[in-house]
């Protein structure tokens, strides 16, 4: 599951056990990322706080658009864990069983709306060559309808998942088997 071991839910500090337990209750399993990061509780708390501030916001980008950023950039970063886990969430949020695979495997060629294309293009630029970012790139995002706060969110989500992708590589984090079918088949 992780080359550095993991912590079971019942062995997590009380606050993390409650927080991760709520996710497990909703999904039916404990995502491996929480079990792996729980070996360093202060870091897991900081990660969850920033993750939730970015990914659970109802302002600006939709929750599906936020997941689109994660899947596209995790694909560019070759992060299997995040592609699989967030691909499941993207499939559920969009009710499209194919979108995550299409975005992760070929984000440049997948058919998207103009707004989604601008989000993916900006996220990929930040993920792969942020030093080359210009005002023209930001103007292209604005022209597609993104506000400055939404542009910020694209960059912040990309940055958070750059860290997450690299930790997943370092730890050899494996996706939970449950993620692979989520959003592909009707719920039982």
Map each language-model feature to its residues.
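Hydrophobic alpha-helical segments
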Residues: 1-188
């Amino acid at each position: 599951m992780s080359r550095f071991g993991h912590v079971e839910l019942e062995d997590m500090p009380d606050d993390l056990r409650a927080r991760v337990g709520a996710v497990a209750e909703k999904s039916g399993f404990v995502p491996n990322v929480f079990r792996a990061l729980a070996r360093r509780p202060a870091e897991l708390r900081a990660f969850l706080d920033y993750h939730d501030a970015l990914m659970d916001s109802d302002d600006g980008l939709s929750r599906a658009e936020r997941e689109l950023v994660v899947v596209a950039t995790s694909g560019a970063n070759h992060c299997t864990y995040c592609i699989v886990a967030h691909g499941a969430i993207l499939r559920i949020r969009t009710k499209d069983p194919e979108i995550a695979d299409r975005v992760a495997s070929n984000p440049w060629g997948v058919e998207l709306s103009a707004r989604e294309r601008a989000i993916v293009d900006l996220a990929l630029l930040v993920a792969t060559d942020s030093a080359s970012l210009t005002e023209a790139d930001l103007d292209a995002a604005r022209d597609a309808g993104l506000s400055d706060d939404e542009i910020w969110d694209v960059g912040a989500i990309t940055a958070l998942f750059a860290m997450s992708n690299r930790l997943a590589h370092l730890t050899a984090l494996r996706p939970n088997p449950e993620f692979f079918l989520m959003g592909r088949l009707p719920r039982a």
